[in-house]
Amino acid sequence: MKKTLLSLLLTFFALCSYAQVDLSYYLPSGYTYDEAIPTPKEILGYEVGEWHVSHDQLVMYMKAVAEASDRVTFEETGRTYEKRPQVMLTISSPANLAKIGQIKADRKKLRDAGASVDIAKMPIVMFMGYSVHGNEPSGANASLLAAYHFAAAKEIAGDLDNMVLLLDPAINPDGLNRFASWVNTHKSYNMNGDPNNAEFNEAWPRGRTNHYWFDLNRDWLPVQHPESRNRVRVFQEWLPNIHLDFHEMGTNSSFFFQPGVPARNHPLTPLKNYELTKKIGTYHAKALDQIGSMYYSEEDFDDYYYGKGSTYPDVQGSIGILFEQASSRGHLQESVNGMLSFPFTIRNQFTANLSSFQAAKDMRQELNQFMKDFYKDIQKEVDSDVNKAYIFGSKEDDARSYHLADLILQHDIKVFSLNDDITVNGKEFQKENSYIVPADQPQYRLIKAMFETRNTFKDSLFYDISAWTYPMAFNLDYMALNSQILNLASVNEITKSSVDLAPGKVIGTAGAYQYAMEWTDYYAPKAAYKLMEADFQVRVATNEFSTADGKVYGRGTLLIGKGESGLDDQAFFNKLVEIAKESTVDIYGLTSGYTGGVNLGSPNMMHLEKPEIALLVEGGVDSYEAGEMCLN
């Protein structure tokens, strides 16, 4: 009995010891820290890794560091769906912080093949993005240590004269907070590492995704969510040389750093990118060796799909680096390698952060020169490419064309609208809803990645998707243009602020016989729901018909009457104007029911009823699919 009790006590104290770490467990030796900079514990009330930091606590600490240090500025870059702030620390020498605008302007010259820039004096920029997957929290918790170290370590003051660090502590604030709430709620002071523990089995939909249960690490290219648009804007403003992306993987694994599988690099990414990534990897290996952590590289993960945080930089002269840490999924969990503690996972991520800093410091000129050469080489590729531009559009739907143009603009790519209609190889592109993207611009490789149709590959296996031709995804007509056709086009450059969807309108007058709305527009379903919500009678044509002015209305056209709304002609008309404007669709007044094809009173006009939708969640429901339904 005494032996059993002793064994239980030893196990208890061993488990407790995993959680009893202080700042010295994480911080490297040989540094002295400015006492004016608050430690995480002084602000949060607990040591890093003792609890999972919530997003509000994370922001609170970042603000405290910025207020205490002349090396750090705090910036809110946007808001999530749940109105949490997306924040970023800019860390550099006070002299650099005083001339941020000039540093950004100089970096833009790296994209200009003809611009002169002094590489020897240019600071290197490193972006550090943590926990885009909210339930991979070692990254966000390591950002506490990174903020403290880079703000307080006295020995790096001189290094910051030549460096700018951009620290985004939580790329997915909503998901991170969801997960922190779960694991902190289920934490026991007497920790149990059994994988069956509730702490490690979070409730649906889990914290990986954002508010609408979307994987934000697949949104760097499509930029469909505010979190993505905000961070892509930061990327395009700064053009970082190194872009760190902190993740987690299965509990029984170790630690991964890029490069990934060599055969699965995207062909548009130059070989030099892989070579530099591998060179930086030697810094990670050395640092992880020093703390005795296991690791691997060049397996499992790849650098193909440009919509991920570690590959989006690769097509823009930057070095994207993925880190994958075996996940404790809570505070302490059994693994095939022994007990895996949350503090251990945080320490590995922070160590890789420090090794990246050292690589950036040592390779500053080399990486700035690489970016400059990257864009110089692009000009040679542009000159040899027979495709000088891409044109896309839809005669039936302004909205889809607009949304693709808007997407492309987010990536610092020039887009032009047409002044006149143009016909290319028998295909007409109308000036109202067509756009041209010239190839001869710095983002040539990214443009090519968006528009090309690639169907031959070195490897038959992929970590992610292998094709993403954007005009096809938007169901648009598109073509590549040669120089002769491009020179014939009359165009105007558009900007984020100048391009917008035109409001819809009602073409006709109050008191029309009926009103018609075509189903070809992207926002037609939105308008249809609003019409039924207003108690209007809505019918759908199952055969086409035509009016006296020769206009043909296809299958799927909606016919709209007052129904049971109780409105007079003018009030009914005014409501239609409101719905058309809000939904950006056009509604047409019809003067007679005697139409070509089927008449408006035909049995082929089927009545629609407003749908009452029940969305199933939890259980066996895929959260990605459910989230997509919620968003739409």
Which residues does each PLM region occupy?
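Bacterial Sec-dependent N-terminal signal peptides
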Residues: M1-L23
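Active-site-proximal loop/turn and secondary-structure-junction residues that shape catalytic pockets
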Residues: I171-P173, E248-G250, S327
